[in-house]
Amino acid sequence: MGQPDASRVLKQIHESVWIAPSAELYGAITIGEGSSVWPQCVIRAECQQVRIGSHTNLQDFVMIHVGYDDPATIGDFCSITHRAVVHGATVEDDCLIGIGAIVMDGAVIGRGSIVAPGAVVTEGTRIPAGSVVAGVPGRVIKSRDYATENRENAWNYWWNAQAYARGEQRAWEGPEFRRFQEKRREPRGS
């Protein structure tokens, strides 16, 4: 068994995407520029599509799976953190899904939101943009747009993925990384 025949699988993965050797990708998957798929991550798209935007990171042990009627869609500059599950749901741009959180079929997480570690967003739930969600079942506990902070986190993971692609596992230390962070924080257009 093992990996399916590549000729029968539709994958559109940008050439700049870093995928850990232990990650497993099955089915119709699109991944945008600068994204990363970390160790032991599994993406399965048997009957619907998985679409992952640009500069998004799927961290260690993440599971992305489609529902029977629902694709899994993750926007640009998102962080889906360790052991989180996105199952047939939509995560809009600039979101962070916390460690061990679960987002179920038909749910929509609005732009710039955070789903707290361990939260469960149940089927069909619509979370407004700029929300913090916590609990089981997940409920909005705070309204604040975290798009800027979430985007910075995604940029940091982009930096780390570039280093891993070169075989460097200590990318977040030293002056070069600090310069990268400072440059990212400079006001635009000045």
Predicted feature locations:
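Glycine-rich hexapeptide-repeat left-handed beta-helix
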Residues: 1-13, 46, 54, 60-62, ...
